[in-house]
UniProtKB/Swiss-Prot annotation:
Cross-referenced Gene3D superfamilies: NAD(P)-binding Rossmann-like Domain
GO molecular function per UniProt: oxidoreductase activity, acting on the CH-OH group of donors, NAD or NADP as acceptor
Family: Belongs to the 3-beta-HSD family.
GO BP, one annotated term: steroid biosynthetic process
Xref: InterPro entries: 3Beta_OHSteriod_DH/Estase (IPR002225), Lipid_A_modif_metabolic_enz (IPR050177), NAD(P)-bd_dom_sf (IPR036291)
Protein name in the entry: Uncharacterized protein 052L
Keyword Transit peptide applies: no
Amino acid sequence: MVKYVVTGGCGFLGSHIVKCILKYAPEVTEVVAYDINISHIMTMWSSKLKVVRGDVMDVMALAKAVDGADVVIHTAGIVDVWYRHTDDEIYRVNVSGTKNVLMCCINAGVQVLVNTSSMEVVGPNTTSGVFVRGGERTPYNTVHDHVYPLSKDRAEKLVKHYTGVAAAPGMPALKTCSLRPTGIYGEGCDLLEKFFHDTVNAGNVAYGGSPPDSEHGRVYVGNVAWMHLLAARALLAGGESAHKVNGEAFFCYDDSPYMSYDAFNAELFEDRGFGYVYVPYWVMKPMAAYNDLKRKFLGCFGVKRSPILNSYTLALARTSFTVKTSKARRMFGYMPLYEWSEAKRRTKDWISTLK
């Protein structure tokens, strides 16, 4: 009898993790999807699934949710490089929220915590250049230009710090690892949905500024979910398997092709008949600066404006950043569950339903 709790379990990644556990982990007798925004549709997925409304900042509700759990997969957090949230909100949820999860796990005697981190703990950033086919030990001058990657870095360090901690003698010492996905795509991806609506509103034309020769690693959400399950199983198994994985961080990628952001989106939306226009950097740079200025000006009057294009996202889109997952393959046998052709088909099938 094994109980899993997935924080952020009704979100884009979290819901796919829940689905993956229900489908591929017959040893699991209960799954709790803990989320501030719950999905009533998910309640019909399985009798094993319990959907609980709760916030990682609510320690009492969180403690109740993880009580009796063997594994907690922590995906809850704010992913935001578009200034939809204040810096304080992002840091509070991503760092303090992670600490709350860790403390509740330790106090409840949870054996395993798998933390969803981000490649942005390492990069890319606006000053350090490209990172091509890099691994966890590849040198890179990490500079956190934005509060989001900074918060994920701090959260990852907290997870490392509390690895091996037990609430009392005789209670389980917490085993952990952190997974660092690249840009996640797939069914339910809000960024792809926003890209679709923005392109339709622009007359079915997408305007992009990522250089054609730049490359980024994008990873299918089903494979990210699969890696979380494999990592949790390795830690739960104990012995040499758990010893190798415990306290480690792993890049999370699959076999999706390395392309520029714009070229990859074009692959996914090829059946929608969109046109694509490359906008040179000398045009994009002042546009991004204008968006930054307008956002700050309107913010003085309490008006939120969060365009995808800003100086930070432009710099990221223009900086090649790709990773390898050989460490995860070596330490806990990760291989993508879905090949690129299947991941692309599934994503395109979902895109075809967008209106």
